[in-house]
């Protein structure tokens, strides 16, 4: 079986939903921007070579419905002969799309695929506009639809994750993210977007202005342990999860160009990484956040690696409680996990996140001269996902 390599990976800066800079930017336009830039970074690659576009989206309806991947591909200037599909595994959708592209390339079913993810939580709320649950599950297994915050409260209790530890983790996320932004660590992976905003001027008149959006806007530099400690529980009166130690609602998009190693050699392009393995696993929906505990051992086995082999880990911070439970249960090295902050500070644009984290981990492996990186996350409905890349 041949190798599938990532030769380009980019993302937008992450907007803070629902009132941030990307609040009026359509998801297909964000997707088009990252697809176009990802392709532009591969010298010699013609648009006609792209056989398929796979984009993940957690809430594929309304502005991000109607096979939004196809709309994004056409808006990016790809020919009508290039097919496209939108896939959904909730929070792992962006990583799932890259894994699916890699699988098709490894088996010889394709040579070049663009894969990524997109999400606008400003336009499409968590759960979508109209939630219509399965009646049988509502009656016989209501926890299947348990609010993710309450599911994470279950995880916090079961794995004995304290409020103080959650707040400390959240503070570290903001501190690390601010330092990474100041050091320009995200600059190479970020595609600047020209955004037109409508707001009021100082006289109360509506005005239109264009801004260049190129920096994640969720980081709160004034975050403190004292401030976090004052926040009230968000999901349960006696709970420990607050708005400060949970991920943010966000907008964003990311895309990667995945191709066979032979095609990369023919183009004279140096791959960023080889996509090694991907695994998913199920867990009780009422303990949704613990999913990576089951997915990580599976992907390590598939890759023939151990945790000691992994140089950098991007563990999506859906909630501090579930992140800490995963770290504690598997014995992950905190110094390898989310070294530049995570979703608590940088945001979590659902279906985009897996592709976004892939773009980030590739740069961090390069900076550290590392070999293996792992992207992992919990998934709504009671699942976990994990993927491993090898820097070349």
Regions found by a protein language model. Name each.
Residues 11-13, 24, 28-33, 44, ...:
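N-terminal extracellular/periplasmic Venus flytrap/periplasmic-binding protein-like
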Residues 179, 255-267, 271-277, 294-301, ...:
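Condensing-enzyme catalytic core of the thiolase-fold
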Residues 27-43, 68-72, 97, 148-155, ...:
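Short, well-ordered amphipathic alpha-helical segments that serve as non-catalytic structural scaffolds
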Residues 87-118, 156-186, 255-262, 327, ...:
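Active-site-proximal alpha-helical scaffold in enzymes
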Residues 1-27, 224-290, 294, 359-360, ...:
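Condensing-enzyme catalytic core mediating Claisen C-C bond formation in acyl metabolism
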Residues 22-112, 117-135, 190-213, 286-287, ...:
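Conserved beta-ketoacyl condensing-enzyme motif
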Residues 25, 57-111, 142-153, 222-248, ...:
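Conserved catalytic cysteine-centered active-site region
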């Amino acid at each position: 079986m041949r190798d599938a390599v990532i030769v380009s990976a980019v993302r937008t800066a992450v907007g803070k939903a629902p009132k941030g800079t990307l609040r009026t930017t359509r998801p297909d336009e964000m997707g088009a921007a990252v697809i176009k830039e990802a392709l532009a970074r591969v010298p010699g690659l013609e648009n006609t070579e792209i056989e398929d576009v796979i984009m993940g989206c957690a809430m594929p309806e309304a502005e991000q419905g109607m096979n939004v991947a196809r709309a994004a591909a056409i808006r990016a200037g790809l020919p009508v002969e290039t097919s496209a599909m939108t896939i959904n595994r909730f929070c792992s959708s962006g990583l799932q799309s890259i894994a699916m592209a890699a699988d098709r390339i490894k088996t010889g079913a394709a040579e070049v695929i663009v894969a990524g993810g997109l999400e606008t939580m400003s336009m499409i709320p968590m759960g979508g506009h109209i939630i219509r649950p399965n009646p049988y599950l509502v009656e016989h297994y209501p926890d299947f639809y348990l609010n993710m915050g309450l599911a994470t409260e279950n995880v916090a209790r079961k794995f004995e994750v304290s409020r103080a530890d959650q707040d400390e983790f959240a503070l570290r996320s903001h501190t690390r993210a601010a330092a990474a932004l100041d050091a320009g660590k995200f600059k190479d992976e970020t595609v600047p977007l020209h955004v037109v905003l409508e707001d009021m001027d100082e006289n109360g008149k509506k005005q239109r202005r264009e801004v260049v959006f190129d920096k994640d806007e969720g980081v709160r530099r004034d975050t403190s342990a004292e401030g976090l400690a004052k926040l009230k529980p968000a999901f349960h009166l006696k709970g420990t999860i607050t708005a400060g130690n949970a991920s943010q609602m966000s907008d964003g998009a990311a895309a990667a160009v995945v191709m066979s190693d032979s095609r990369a050699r023919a183009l004279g392009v140096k791959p960023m990484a080889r996509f090694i393995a991907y695994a998913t696993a199920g867990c009780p929906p009422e303990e949704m956040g613990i999913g990576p505990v089951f997915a990580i051992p599976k992907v390590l086995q598939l890759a023939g690696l151990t945790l000691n082999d992994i140089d950098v880990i991007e563990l999506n911070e859906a909630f501090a409680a579930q992140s800490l439970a995963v770290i504690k249960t598997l014995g992950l090295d905190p110094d390898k996990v989310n070294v530049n902050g995570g979703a608590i500070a940088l945001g979590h644009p659902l279906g985009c996140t897996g592709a976004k984290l892939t773009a980030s981990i590739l740069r961090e492996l390069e900076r550290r001269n590392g070999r293996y990186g792992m992207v992992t996350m919990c998934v709504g409905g009671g699942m976990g996902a994990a993927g491993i890349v090898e820097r070349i």
